[in-house]
Amino acid sequence: MARRSQSSSLGDNPLDPNYLRPHYREEYRMAIDALVEDDIEGYYNFLQNANVVDFLSRSEIENIKSTVQTPQSAGNVPELPYGEIDQDESSDTYWPLHSDLDAPGLDLGWPMQQHSFVGPTEVTMLVNPAEPERPSIKEQARRLIKNAHQVIAVVMDIFTDVDIFSDLLEAAARHVPVYILLDEQNAHYFVNMVASCKVNLEMIHMMRVRTVSGVTYFCRTGKSFKGQVMDRFLLTDCRAVISGNYSFMWSFEKIHRCIAHLFLGELVATFDEEFRILFAQSQPLVVENALVPMPQDSYLGNQFGLKRTQSLRNPRGYLRQPELGGYQYGDRLDSILPFRRDDPFRHTIEPSAGPMQVTKYATQQFRMQQSFLDQGRSMLASRQLEMNAFKRHSYAEGTRETYASSRQYMKQRVMNNLEETESHYQREQHYYQSEGMGHDDRGHYDRFNYGLADQHSDSGYPPELEAPGNINVLSSDDLKSDSEKQYNIGGRYDPQGHKRPAAGHAYACQSSPTQPHPPDQKQLFSTGDQVRQSQDPSVKQGLRSWRINSYLSTYEDGGEEGLHQPMGSDAFEDSHQQPDSRLYGSEGPGIHSNIRERPNIPTKPNLDLRPRFGKPIIQDRNQVKDNTSDLGPTSTDTLKPAISASSLASSTDNEKELAEPREISITKHESFRTRINPMLQRSSRLRSSLIFSSSKLEQHNSSQAKSGGELQEEKEESEPIRYSSIVAEILEKRRSLSREPFDWNKHKKADEKDVKHASTGDLTTIQDTKEEPIKEKEKPDNPKPEENKVTQPTVPSASQQITSSLNMNDPASRLQYFKDQQEKRKTSKLELDLGTKSQEAAIKKPETLDTATKVPDVLLTSEQSTVKAQEPTVSQTDPVPHRPVIETKPKPSEVSVDRPYTTNKTLTESIADAPKKEPVKEPTKSLKPFPSPKFLKPFKSSQSSSRRISCGEEILTDATDAEKSELKKSRSFSTSGMSRTESRESLSSLGNSESKDTKALDFLKKQTQRLKGILGPKGDKKHSGVSNSQEDKSMKTVPEVQEEISDKGKPSESISSSTAVENKPSAKPTTSRYQSSTSNIIFSSNLRDDTKVILEQISANSQKTRQQNEESGKGDGGKDDVANSPFQSRNRFSRAPVNPQERDNLLKRIESMRKEKKVYSRFEVLYRSREECCWERGSVEQANQFLIKSIE
């Protein structure tokens, strides 16, 4: 195709006054052909014969002669198979539409083009020598470089000015991308200058040096020669440009006269575009070629060094040395660079020396030069200044600068630096943690980047000093084989190591400017397998074990393994994660337990999380608080607020072992659970199906076994597991709600179907596995779990518990209890008396309570959700049966119905366990733990109920804002206190719910009736209506009935479903602190799906229970209504009475919707009501209220 010069006059009218005669002459072209073919004599002969003036200067003739290239013979080019080529994109056409090579990318970044007007163009002319009062061209260029923040782009024919180069290195050290395009033929000048400065361009990760050639001129015989790039301009931030005939050379500053212009404004866009065009046409700087200027006769001939290595024959093979140097000018590579071997086999002389024998001697030399460089940057210098000179066979080798262009050399380097990739993860982590700029995470040059050897050796410079910018001074130790070197963590944390922008690259050239080119990648990746081997054992094994465990493991280990770092903290969890820390490498199972350097927990923004492959250490609840400050990499500040559910889920064995030391890991995992964990989702999927089926079976059994007294024992056994699982599910839901919309239809269907097919055996297995750990765990828990167990602070709840126990076991006692309640309502004294009586009743009938509680788990959940927290809040601190702690101090009027639906298992367990234990003693304990029981109850209920909102979230509504704050506190405490065994117990309680169903149903019915009577429709609507008197006495202690399952030896599950009823601030329910732990348990159990299942179960059970309650508890309900009516009016959250029939209809409709929608979302738990869609993220109370609204 004719060039513009050939067609310059095409179409022009000779008569046009602006007509320009064509300057193209065929004689010129023929003369060039004669010069190329017949040398200079043929050229002159042709000029004479054609009567053409000599149009070439002597320098041009010499340049053409030196750069002529002959076409490759067909024999030298391998035959390439050509397939069918699309006609539209044919590559064999004369002018192919698409190149077969990708254009290099501006991988370091480039400012976004501003489409807005940047301002009028301003042009300032600069001359050299400069006028006295005007800055020189060099000064202006250096000022622009210094002030650049986004990008620096240089296009230069010859670049040998060390001062400007030093400024560019400093800019690269500031993480300002620096792109340098050099003329291909003059690139060797630049390489020599860099070598003399002892800089390894490979180590400068923020600098890309490439070469560009001029236009290629093709002769008719196939020979060709290239021109040169004579552009000279400096572009900074795409806002300012200096352009002219000023080259970055000393002579241009001192002796040459030149002119340059400073452009600002719109005109800069043209330079921006031009640079990007040139960069796309550029080739990587091949130091091998550049270092040895070719003889004039064959500038690109074989002498060019292609003979030395195979990689050079394919220039792309060595594409660019990883942009020489990460050292800033001041920290140039070691003096190794100064001498270079031209021996073609120099790279093979010492394969092991491949890593470049850069030594501290070089550093010392450079130090001497530092005054000259005047970088002011600290250099990593080792006292071992002597280098093994004999090992440095070449300047290129010694520097690791990829001057060695052979791929073999590259492989050697990679092989010698396998350990670099091992440290890759930590380096990367460090990179993010540290503010400093790590030179390079590229495994190959980590040593240099991080100055590991220097750090560990006696370094002349303190390690805290950052390597100047990106410049790293290498020592011979740095270059030793990996086996010889041992990395210290400090090496990775070396300030030098933080400058690397591409933290993810494991390979030396990965971030190199020429990286994009396939040959470079091939070089790196061919050895990459070896490099990766170090990672494989830990990471791959961990991933593999995680997958297996996620699917196959029971709750013991499934929750922990392979979980990503916590993505976020729960709304109620005040976890303070250190944003700095990131976990990249797989952690050994024990790594997180005691390491306290920095919590390596990635902050929420960090999404590139790697799963932890170790089980978290579970601390004693007492220790958790203390240890939260000492969190290791596995624990975050969130330890206090919540114990990671995963840790709860993890095997109790770990808990035992880890309990002795302060275990930090627990809390960290809590934060895990707070966010939806895909891994958890996987494991929970399998479990959820089991839970569904188990819950169904439980419901069915509960309906059938209303009078099954013999089932009580079984229920008691299974209660801890079942309760814990239910609570965990509820809590799981609550957390998931904060992040996930809940689909009632899906849940209902999944619940019904899955519950029907639930494998009770699996749950029982989980129970068995967890019961023992729970028992053991209870012991380590120390007084706190005991308090939780004991703390069932709700005098009203106690009365209710008694009532429930009475309802479950003795109608006469229930009747008496109702009478007592009425008396209490009449007078505050009576209320107190009733509270005492209820405690006594609980003591008298612990077994009945246990049975009742156990059975009602699911039923109770539904019923109580209907009743809306009429039942006393029961926080199942421990799966071990606890005597219901009834607050004698709190007034019975404040009886807050436990949100059994929320803590179904906890309520039932606490009720069932309460009779076994001395209720009076427990109340005192329960009173101690929490100043504001309401919050605690709502907190637990929020944990459990938020996830299981379908049953009814009574608790949430009751809590006031102050209560909410307390909820968070209590939750954090409980979470931190919570142990994995507890979570397992909750799971096991789910499995055992069946045995509890028979009496639980009776109890639930009776209690629900009683609660309905007490709270009336208002109370029902108000799940939050903990106790009507509670509202009056909002600050009363929370009536939390927390079962101490200590009898069973299981860790108390501090799931206080009890609504927060603050009868008296004096009462401090400790349970609340552990209540949150149940939520953690749920999380650890990976019960997101399970939680949904439970919600569905609860809703179904609530329907059944309501129906049963309506049948069996009508008489009781009337009494309760009478007794509770005054309190209802007091309830802040009291609502207009809701017709139970309507609720039943609503529940039925929900079930039908669920049935219709068989598939439920594992990730979305959305509470939908007619008016609003409440994302359960903050307040459990709000969730409960919302649930109530939806039910109504």
Curated annotation (Swiss-Prot):
Pfam families: SACK1 (PF07894)
Start-end of Polar residues biased regions: 523-538, 629-652, 790-810, 861-878, 1068-1082
Compartments in which it is found: Cytoplasm, Cytoskeleton
InterPro entries: FAM83, PLDc_FAM83H_N, SACK1
Basic and acidic residues bias locations: 437-447, 737-759, 768-789, 820-834, 880-892, 914-925, 994-1005, 1107-1122
Compositional bias annotation for Low complexity: 926-946
Region of interest (Disordered), ranges: 435-542, 557-661, 695-720, 737-1082, 1094-1145
Name of the protein this chain belongs to: Protein FAM83H
Gene: fam83h
